[in-house]
Regions:
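Beta-strand/loop-rich accessory regions of lumenal/periplasmic or secreted enzymes
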Residues: 394-680
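A short beta-turn/strand-edge loop motif at beta-sheet boundaries
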Residues: 325-332, 510-514
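Extended substrate-binding grooves/exosites of carbohydrate-active enzymes
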Residues: 2-316, 320, 326-331
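Solvent-exposed, conformationally flexible loop/turn segments
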Residues: 313-314, 352-357, 658, 664-669
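Low-complexity, Pro/Ser/Thr- and charge-rich linker/hinge segments at domain boundaries
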Residues: 8-28, 387-409, 529-534
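Intrinsically disordered, low-complexity Pro/Gly/Ser/Thr-rich segments with frequent PxxP/GP/PP motifs
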Residues: 338-369
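Terminal connector regions
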Residues: 366-397
Length: 680
């Protein structure tokens, strides 16, 4: 048998004068940017091919991951060979999982723990990628002699690698059976390190997957998760004694079952596909990149550059930069620079050593507005940035000096503008329709929009009023939802048809940990075709089509996805999915109405434009990056939602869920600026 081997040296536990709370590979401290992973194949279930294993590890490397935890069993030989060749560290775990903890008993003899552990060690000890041995996952150490037998065996046969065990809090005897302390789902703002030994958060920042209602309502939860990892990793890297993190998990645990198969042991889904859930930080079950893949790549990036700290002076752009590689100096990288969208050219990088920082100095011509930077290692891009030097002037809407006209009948209030018309019902105290150029763009509203609390039916308790004030038509609508809460909407309509709507609650207070969105909504016709937006995004560069991009257009329909239908093998990207056979049942009326990209809430918008089919018209929300917007489709129509407050209360598992929402009645809750226009 021919076996490829490699050489490297590990220091841990304070050996040779090193720090006891750090792990060293070849003399340098390492920080593990990791993920857990299961074996998942759309064709083979839990059985993967050599090519699938290689492609998986390659995708992790592209996401700036340098470590995997083989939860909760040894991987295939193919996967370890891929890790050896691609430079991926491995925590290899014995197949002892959920034994004697969390209410689970133990039915195996101690020897049955030792046997698979010794087989794993003897099979894989020559792989240099394996740097940590794991005795088992989330188990009670003292409930069996098996775990102590594993520890004694490994210390007698391979003391060169450290040992980890989860749960360490169940250990009551000495010597401690681990050299690295395992911690699961520590809060991203919590205690991350230790002065006595390295802490590896080998289950961290769980990817959103369990609350299907949240996932079905708004795909932006995938995007929102990224801020937890970014914040958590920035704290982990600089925390003494924090070895790193392994996200849960790497690839979606979802299995597209063959048609007609009824038997299944896992029923987490609402659709026909089975599995634990869509918990992949990089790949979905079809091995497509998920939105989390780019967010993982950015959060884990070893090139740390803050565009906001860049300074342009004397024909040079000065940029502070940090090297968070463990063994790679910046001299080994290539930096490509493009000014104002021009051809990229190579720029010399300073020789910044690992875990050090310095300054980039880049020549830029006078009057340059943007500088795009791409850091390369060979042919692989590590990270990319775009630094804006001069903000382009934002176009201002031309003022209309022709005020609107108000006419009233017994049943309606009409506001006529230059190209727009608003009709309000006196009976319901609601907008009946809003037209622009003769096309109906809004069909109802405004509505108080909340998720996480049921509202009663709208009833008016006071007739609407309208009058001209300072050249605007001001319309005041009063009503309540099932008697409470009472809400007042005030619309200020300009002569060009643009308007601002303010709303406030009239009495009491309202606090609910389940609240996820608070804002207002308008009904729209069902032939919405696309949404376009500009927003303040966390990153300056995104891949084409990423749901988090700062500027973009999302089509409601992906023709190939719609034609293929429910449960089909995709020939398109994740963001263009219209059917999800894990989240939606085949007959769910909410499924198949729009793409993931279209349904995603856009946070911190400056503009959010909804376009109707055939150029019939458009509705645009204008803001100062302080609101969020999305369109919710239904079989018989659409609803434009503008949120002033939002969070994701079911992210949990150590993630940042956003601040709990509370509403004080009697105070203004918020406002939205909306423009109506002709189609483009």
């Amino acid at each position: 048998m021919c076996e490829r081997v490699g050489f490297r040296e590990i220091h841990y536990g304070g050996r040779d004068g090193t720090d006891a709370n750090k792990l060293y590979v070849n003399g340098r401290e390492v920080k593990l940017r990791g993920t857990c992973r299961h074996d998942v194949s759309p064709r083979g279930g839990r059985s993967t091919t050599a090519q699938e294993d290689w492609d998986e590890i390659s995708a992790y490397r592209d996401a700036n991951i340098n470590h995997i935890r083989t939860s909760h069993y040894p991987p295939s030989r193919h996967l370890l060979r891929a890790c050896d060749e691609l430079g991926m560290y491995v925590e290899e775990e014995n197949s002892a999982c959920f034994k004697g903890a969390n209410g689970v008993d133990i039915y195996a003899a101690p020897e049955e723990f030792l046997s698979p552990f010794t087989e794993m060690v003897e099979r894989d000890r020559n792989h240099p990628c394996v740097i940590i041995w794991s005795l088992g996952n989330e188990s009670g150490f003292e409930r069996t002699a098996g775990f102590r037998m594993e520890y004694d065996y490994i210390k007698a046969n391979d003391p060169s690698r450290p040992v980890i065990f989860s749960y360490p809090h169940t250990v009551e005897t000495l010597p401690l059976p681990y050299d690295v302390c395992s911690r699961h789902y520590e809060d991203v703002n919590g205690v991350l390190g230790s002065p006595s030994m390295p802490v590896l958060h080998d289950e961290f920042a769980h990817i959103p997957c369990y609350d299907l209602d949240e996932l079905r309502r708004d795909p932006n939860v995938h995007n929102y998760w990224g801020q937890s990892l970014r914040r958590g990793w920035e704290r982990l890297f600089v925390t003494d004694g924090a070895l790193g993190a392994d996200l849960w998990g790497g690839i979606d645990d979802v299995f597209p079952l063959p048609e007609g198969m009824e038997g299944r042991w896992q029923r987490h889904s609402q659709g026909t596909w089975s599995g634990y859930g869509e918990w992949g930080c990089v790949l979905d079950c079809w091995r497509r990149l998920k939105p989390e893949a780019y967010l993982t790549r950015k959060a884990y990036s070893p090139v740390r550059l803050d565009e906001r700290a860049a300074v342009s002076y004397g024909g040079k752009l000065i940029v502070p930069v940090k090297n968070w590689f463990d063994h790679t100096g910046f001299a080994e990288l290539k930096l490509m620079c493009a000014v104002d969208g021009g051809s990229p050219c190579k720029v010399a990088l300073p020789a910044i050593e690992p875990h050090a920082e310095g300054l980039l100095a880049i020549d830029v011509p006078e009057g340059a507005q943007s500088v795009a930077l791409s850091f390369m290692r060979g042919a692989r891009e590590i990270d990319a940035f775009c630094i804006r030097l001069k903000g382009a002037a934002r176009a201002k809407s031309a003022a209309c000096d022709c005020p609107p006209a108000i006419s009233q009948t017994r049943d309606e209030i009409c506001v006529d503008c230059r190209s727009a018309r608003f009709v309000f019902s006196r009976r319901s105290s609601q907008l009946v329709r809003a037209e622009f150029g003769g096309e109906v763009l809004l069909t109802g509203g405004p509505h108080l929009h909340v998720t996480g609390r049921e509202l009663g039916a709208w009833n008016t308790y006071r007739a609407p009023v309208a009058s001209l004030v300072d050249g605007q038509a001001v319309v005041v609508l009063h009503g309540s939802y099932g008697g409470s809460p009472r809400v007042q909407f005030v619309l200020h309509i300009n002569g060009d048809g643009s308007f601002t709507v303010e709303y406030q609650l009239a009495e009491g207070s309202w606090r609910n940990a389940e609240l996820a969105e608070v804002g207002l909504a308008f009904d729209m016709p069902g032939d919405v075709e696309s949404v376009s937006w500009e927003r303040e995004a966390p990153y300056s560069v995104y891949p084409e089509g990423h749901i988090g991009r700062g500027l973009g257009t999302a089509q409601r329909v992906c023709a190939p996805a719609l034609e293929a239908g429910y449960g089909a093998k995709p020939g398109w990207e994740w963001q263009d999915d219209m059917f999800n056979a894990f989240e939606f049942a085949p007959d769910d009326p909410a499924g198949g109405l729009a793409t993931n990209d279209f349904r995603t809430m856009r946070e911190h918008i400056r503009s959010y434009e909804v376009s109707l089919a055939a150029g019939r018209g458009r509705v645009c929300v204008k803001a100062n990056a302080d609101v969020a917007a999305r369109v919710e489709m239904a079989p018989k129509g659409a609803r434009l939602i503008v949120d002033m407050l939002w969070r994701y209360p079911h992210l949990g598992w150590g993630n940042d869920m956003g601040r709990e929402l509370s509403l004080l009645f009697g105070g203004a809750l918020g406002a939205a600026r909306i423009e109506l226009g002709a189609g483009k």
